[in-house]
């Protein structure tokens, strides 16, 4: 009897312990159901906390891309209702999740990135600057008119200190005309140099209009640097004079002798260019020096 009574007491104690454990387990699901991380069923409502991740702000409806492709059980992805009216073969359907992601540097809920200078702002600043320059020019003109300056409105047509542009300006008329003239004379460009687009060469060596001495002897220059032909135009296409007919061989090949003996160009007194190319179609003979 004692053994049966002890067994009954142990069985009763175990039954009480199991009942208490079952009661405590029934009370816990109400607390943990709101923070459960298990995916809900197909008919269960979505209980996802739509907060931005801690790495960066991606917008109100933006979500990070999930590297794993789980279209059926991806409860972290976008709502299936967003793509319900699209075909599965469309490009946007394939890249819909990627295209609807907010950029990593998204500023604000529906805002855009900050642009420091816009086109409208630059146009406004440009107009303000032009208006300020006009006011300064008008103010300067009025001050000069009030001071009685007669030179207002005069257009100078010569550069006061040498060549200062394509069509230089004259020095302003005043008491320093002589000084300006001397300054212009001293600031001339050197001999045989270009004085601008509309300028001319210095007149001190006008009779030396030949190419300078160089190793290449230029294509249209002459070999001698300071040979003076009295400003005559020496031809290249001149003809032989009748007095030099005796130099021919007599058999009608007088013109061919220059092909065999080209030095006759230098020795013969004819209308050929004595030393290189010195013209194109002139007719005047070269004067003997």
Swiss-Prot record:
Record PTM Asparagine amide, positions in chain = 95
Region entry Disordered, spans: 28-80, 156-175
Cellular component GO terms held in the UniProt record = extracellular space
One of this protein's GO BP terms?
A: positive regulation of hindgut contraction
- Which parts of the sequence carry Arginine amide? 61, 110, 167, 198, 237, 281
Q: What is its main location?
A: secreted
Leader sequence segment:
1-24
The propeptide sits at 25-49, 285-289
Q: What does this protein do?
A: Tachykinins are active peptides which excite neurons, evoke behavioral responses, are potent vasodilators and secretagogues, and contract (directly or indirectly) many smooth muscles. Stimulates gut muscle contractions.
Name of the featured protein? Tachykinins
Source species: Drosophila pseudoobscura pseudoobscura
Question: Quick one: which gene encodes this?
Answer: Tk
């Amino acid at each position: 009897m004692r053994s049966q009574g002890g067994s009954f007491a142990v069985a009763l104690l175990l039954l009480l312990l199991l009942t208490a454990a079952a009661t405590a387990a029934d009370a816990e699901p109400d607390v943990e159901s709101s923070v459960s991380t298990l995916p809900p069923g197909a008919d269960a409502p979505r209980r996802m906390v739509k907060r931005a991740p801690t790495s960066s702000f991606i917008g109100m409806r933006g979500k990070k891309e999930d590297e794993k492709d789980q279209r059926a059980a991806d409860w972290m992805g976008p709502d299936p209702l967003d793509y319900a009216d699209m075909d599965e073969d469309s490009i946007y359907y394939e890249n819909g999740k990627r295209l609807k992601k907010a950029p990593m540097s998204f500023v604000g809920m529906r805002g855009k990135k900050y642009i420091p200078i816009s086109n409208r702002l630059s146009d406004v600043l440009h107009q303000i600057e032009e208006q300020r320059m006009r006011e300064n020019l008008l103010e300067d003109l009025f001050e000069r008119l009030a001071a009685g300056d007669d030179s207002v409105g005069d257009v100078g047509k010569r550069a006061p200190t040498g060549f200062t542009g394509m069509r230089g300006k004259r020095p302003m008329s005043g008491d320093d005309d002589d000084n300006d003239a001397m300054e212009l004379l001293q600031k001339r460009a050197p001999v045989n140099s270009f004085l601008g687009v509309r300028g001319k060469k210095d007149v001190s060596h006008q009779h030396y209009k030949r190419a300078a001495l160089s190793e290449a002897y230029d294509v249209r220059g002459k070999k001698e640097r300071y040979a003076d032909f009295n400003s005559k135009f020496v031809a290249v296409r001149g003809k032989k004079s009748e007095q030099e007919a005796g130099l021919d061989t007599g058999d009608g090949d007088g013109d061919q002798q220059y092909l065999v003996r080209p030095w006759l160009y230098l020795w013969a007194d004819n209308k050929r260019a004595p030393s290189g190319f010195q013209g194109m179609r002139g007719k005047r003979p070269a004067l003997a020096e």
